[in-house]
Regions:
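Low-complexity, polar-biased intrinsically disordered regions enriched in Pro/Ser/Thr/Gly
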Residues: 185-191
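Short peripheral tails and domain-boundary helices/loops at the edges of structured domains
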Residues: 223-225
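Append "with occasional cross-activation on large, charged helical scaffolds in nucleic-acid assemblies
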Residues: 1-163, 169, 176, 180, ...
């Protein structure tokens, strides 16, 4: 991530060899006024390890807190309920017998793994529904042109995000040149045209396909802005 940000010409301060939560916050603060901020903040988020539930207290990296647990949320999650049960066992039932502790130690491993798996499943479901509804919406806009920003660069094409948050793919097989993919710099460069596409570039696109059934939206690039 830091290498890519540097390739855009931005110089970041701080000790990048010893990344702390405060370092990440400083990086985001330095980038907040840049036109690519939304793209870069999402990229930084994807670079970070996915959080999982564990029986042991390992603190909270983002909050820079050595002590952290789930307690409540807008929707009552199972980890929240588990913490409530533990507190009730200790505070109200005053049950700290070795047998009780041993029972919970065994249960918490299973509960943590199960909760992590269900959260991943819920996230996948949410993404699929979002993709389906975006494709359904764009089915009635095929042939229309929009300005957008390149949100991701892959070996198979470019993802472009429109101002209305709809994201579609520009398949590399349908681009009018042979494009070379640079994974480190996250760019596609035309072999003949020398046109170079990177994260944050603004482009004018046309909607060429959209399917609710496949949850796919395809664009074609008209020109780089």
């Amino acid at each position: 991530f830091l290498s890519f940000v540097s390739s855009l010409g931005y110089t970041l301060k701080g000790n990048i060899k010893n990344i702390k939560p405060t370092t990440i916050q400083k990086i985001l603060n330095e980038l907040k006024d840049k036109k690519e901020y939304k793209i870069l903040s999402n990229l930084l988020l994807r670079c970070m390890q996915k959080a999982v539930y564990k029986p042991e207290n390992i603190g909270h990296y983002g909050l820079a807190s050595p002590c952290y647990t789930h307690f409540t949320s807008p929707i009552r999650r199972y980890p929240d309920t588990t913490v409530h049960r533990l507190l009730r066992t200790y505070l109200f039932n005053h049950d700290m017998k070795p047998s009780t502790l041993h029972k919970w130690q065994e249960k918490l491993i299973y509960i943590a793994d199960w909760s992590s798996a269900r959260e991943r499943s819920a996230d996948d479901c949410e993404r699929e529904v979002e993709d389906m509804k975006m494709a359904e919406y764009m089915e009635s806009h095929i042939g229309e042109e929009y300005e957008g920003m390149i949100s991701s660069v892959m070996s198979f094409g470019l993802f472009v995000e429109l101002p209305n948050m709809v994201e579609g793919l520009v398949p590399i097989r349908e681009m009018d040149d042979y494009f070379v993919y640079d994974e480190e710099q996250m760019t596609l460069t035309g072999e003949k045209s020398k046109i170079r596409y990177k994260l944050g570039d603004k482009v004018l696109i046309k909607v060429i396909r959209a399917s609710k059934e496949t949850r796919n939206i395809d664009f074609e690039i008209i020109k780089k802005l």
